[in-house]
């Protein structure tokens, strides 16, 4: 329904063949990466790059896709202000009524993108631009859309994913007289952006008792939790099925070490296990095992107190002699 609302005229008036001339590939990244680990409540900027699979056309004429983010609110993508993308956005191009950045609905963005003025419209106010050729040709990818979101305050893995991609390309050799013929473009590969939200970052995975080593646990509960009290807990018997503390599931199994960390905060074994997060929601603790921990794997996680509304993921530490 949404697709036909703003592109029907372009598709029906200028597409003469149902055979796909090229495929459009998408790549969603942040800082040129498709998979990153960040803390809770962190702002993330993303780019969505498009590239045609070959040079069998004269470039992109129209594109649209949906975007979903499993980690919370997703606002509209940015309105383009420079070429080539401003040729695809109102008023130079044509996009859906909600804007080039997509229609927000049920936590998703529907139909990000737009079309160039391939019908050479001069009657209606929109579209009123001139067509750019060779947009997103193979070997010359372009940024189709940019935007921002904030990571979840619940630790886990989330994906910014594009779906329902459809596009047209300008037929090779076209001059724009009387209009620009376009051909269907297939949906190519889509590389989504995967975000791991972690609240603990250990400095090392293994410590030696004889070398008097320690594992420093850098805590990050996000800026909304600044100034709150935290408690680091531990277990020597794994993370599943875990237990419940003050109504919140904690991914640590109850054993003697768990009870020790619960009832003896700030011990010589788990230094600074209870404290107050700083103005950015960060803190630190340190695991300093003695000989009784040799050849064991300790797991640690932290919760926030009063009330207990936040729990981190577990992080492990292998203790060697």
Residue ranges with predicted function:
Residues 5-17:
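Bacterial N-terminal signal peptides
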Residues 7-10, 30, 267-269, 285:
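Short, functionally important structural connectors and interaction interfaces within domains
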Residues 198-321:
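Residue-level hotspots within well-ordered secondary structure
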Residues 21-205, 229, 288-321:
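Acidic, low-complexity intrinsically disordered segments
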